[in-house]
Structure formats: structure tokens, C-alpha cells
Amino acid sequence: FMNIVTYATPGAFLADNQAYLRDHEVEAQLNLGNAVAHREEPCGPELLFGKVEEQGRAVLLFGYLVPWNLCLDDVAHSDSGVQAARELALWLKAQEIVVPGVNGRQVLCEAFLQVWGSAYELRIAMDAMVLRRLHAPLPKGGALRLAVPEDEEVAAPWIAAFQQEAGHRELPLEMAREKFQKRVEKGTLYLFETRAGTPVFMATVSRFLPHGKCISGVYTEPGSRGQGYCQEAMALLCQRLMGQGDEYVALFVDKTNPVSNRAYQKIGFEIVEDNCDYRLKEGT
């Protein structure tokens, strides 16, 4: 028998599941990050955190924040987690809570979607990776630095291009400029320059976790790809973050980009879990 438990606040979710979340920060980072950001807000249909229990033991954690996907965390890593995903789909339908999609391990997402019954598509299949010990490549003489307002004409088009390459909806340049400006204000956007001072790479520190940080928006200018800049830049960024006290650096990578993924592995990143992003098709 499975039982679904929901929480009054994201903070209560964090407290009740702290042991799992502490030991699996990288795998659970989407729910963990959202719960921390909205810790004291009251939960409801548009901000929902819970767990599915089997015989009093959590086998699946879930979180939903409008307008984002439902996120599933596989506590059990067994058939119990798969069955819990099915039970959760039935429960959400009974509560008339409609989600735009689901993120999590492929086996969980597919079990959920089969019960949900609507048409869906796989937007991207990813691996969650983590680096705890850096293997620095031989330096090429480039330099990593924080982006400054004067970089907007270079970096804003890159942000728009990254969105398109990653399969997201097209991002108008003006919106890309806004994203650039916010990241510069927060001090989260980094650029890598060649020895000649030419920017060729960018990455964003996008999620601050209790013991580490997550990097996203990794982009190398097309004309500079295949020359080792990404590998060196990522090594420098990880070195900087871990030098500031982080125990690890996390990253989601596209399964269909093995060249980049090998570059990450060469500097010490390891795959910890698969993560798929499924979207429900509108009108189904």
C-alpha cells in the first residue's frame, strides 16, 4: 500500500526529508533548489511538495512549482519508485492538478506519463554529473573572468544562441539582454578569453546548493569549438568555486553531445544519474 504525503510549506518538506536531500544534493537539486527558494511560502496547487511512502518509508519525492515541470526524485531506485510514480499520476489527476511536463529518471517519467494518458514528447535526455576532485588540463594561457556590463554585445547573443541550441523556445535578443544584465548584477556569469583577450566561452553559476553549485548555460562560440577551450574554462571555473569552499560542482549534460561530455569527464566530472525532461503536448 502506498500513501501520498504533502507538506504545508517547502520548509517542512526540507526538514522531513533532510537525510536524503543531504546525501543526494546533486540528484535532488531541482526540488532542493525550489524548496529552499520558497521555504516559508504556503503550499497549494501551484506550489506543491510531497513524498510517496510505502509501508511508512519514502520511495519517491516530488515537487511542482508553476510554470515549471513536476520534478521526481527516486529515493528507492527500485520497482517501488516506478509504482510510486504511477500512484502520483493518479493522485494528481484526482486532485485536478495539471502539470506541463515531468523531470526525473527516465524510468520514473515514463511510468508517470503512461498513467497520465496525454501525448508527450522528450525535450531533452540528460545526465546529472558531479565533480568532487579536479583533474586540471594543461593550460593554454587563457583566462576566466566574471562578465561585466561592457560584455553585453558579445554575451547576450550567445545567451540567445544557447537557448536555441539547447532546444528551448527561441529567445528574443532583448530578453537575452535582460538575462545577461541580471546575471552580471548577481555575479554569476563567467567568460573565458584566449591569450589574445578574445572571449570564446561562457557559463553561468545557476543554482546554489548547500554544499556546492550547479553550472549551466555552457556555451563555446561556434568558430572556437574543438580547440579545448571548454575543458580549460570549466576546469578554471570549478577550481575557482571549490577554492571558495564548495565541496562539489554539478552540471546537467545533454546525452546526445558525447564530445562535450568526454571533455567534462577528463577534468573529473562523473555521471551520478540520468534525468529526462518530458513535455506534455498542448490540447491532449
Placement of each model-derived feature along the sequence:
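Short amphipathic alpha-helix that is part of the acyltransferase structural core
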Residues: 1-30, 134-169
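Acetyl-CoA-dependent GNAT
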Residues: 63-68, 163, 167-168, 174-216
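Acyl-donor-binding surface of acyltransferase catalytic domains
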Residues: 66-141, 278
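Conserved GNAT acetyl-CoA-binding A-motif
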Residues: 96-105, 241-253
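Conserved acetyl-CoA-binding loop of GNAT-fold acetyltransferases
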Residues: 117-123, 265-274
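Conserved acetyl-CoA-binding loop-helix of GNAT-fold acetyltransferases
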Residues: 80-91, 216-222, 226-243, 261-266
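Conserved beta-strand-loop-alpha-helix junction that forms the acyl-donor binding cleft
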Residues: 103-109, 251-261, 278-283
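Conserved donor-binding loop and adjoining core beta-sheet/short helix segment
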Residues: 2-8, 21, 25, 33-95, ...
